[in-house]
Amino acid sequence: MIYAGTELEKCAANHTALSPVSILKRVERVHPELPAQVHGSIRRNWGEVAQRCKRLASALANHGVSSGDTVALIAPNIPEALECALAIPMLGAVLNANNVRLDAATIAYILEHGEAKALLVDTEFSSMAKEALKQSGRDILVIDIQDTQGPGGERIGALTYDELLAQGDPEFAYTLPNDEWDALALNYTSGTTGRPKGVVYSHRGAWT
């Protein structure tokens, strides 16, 4: 066969890693003015969301989060959750988004098992998160998300989400993953027959 023993090398001309991060990169360039977030009185376009994501990624990096680190999230379907889903993979870090209905003991196990380096938590769930952190024994960076459209709650973190964003760079230079099979998210099963099981999603898997 003519191609026997040969292999086409990957290069920028014939290959790019599949990743949801590339969607944000494109929409910021092509349609920055289109609406991206509608949450109560909050309205943001894709240009604004992209800048917030870059600020978040930059600020987390400044706090020591790097490629391969797990960043946990406890929040409902709010704008900050979308930003975490896009910003954390910009660093090559892994998003661990948790079901807000889980109890403290289960969250504690997930934080420990997933080796979370940071936790972003909506203050609506701060009581549960506080107990989970206590049970896990992990000393990690905690960021309070104060959802202006939600009921709110006690602050338990070192700083708020908005304070964290203020520390970030809106022009943060991020790249796509070197390998599309790199981990993007760490999800957990319900643990029906035992402890929750970790399930890793790759950049490619999340894309497809």
Where are the regions that the model predicts?
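Conserved AMP-binding/adenylate-forming core of the ANL superfamily
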Residues: 16, 33-86, 103-108, 162-163
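Conserved AMP-binding A3 loop
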Residues: 45-47, 184-208
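Conserved S/T- and glycine-rich ATP-binding loop of Class I adenylate-forming
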Residues: 71, 88, 119, 183, ...
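Flexible acidic/glycine-rich loop/turn elements at helix↔coil and beta-strand↔loop transitions
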Residues: 26-32
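Structural core segment of the AMP-binding/adenylate-forming
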Residues: 62-63, 90-166
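Conserved pre-ATP/AMP-binding loop-to-beta segment of ANL
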Residues: 32, 143, 157-159, 167-188, ...
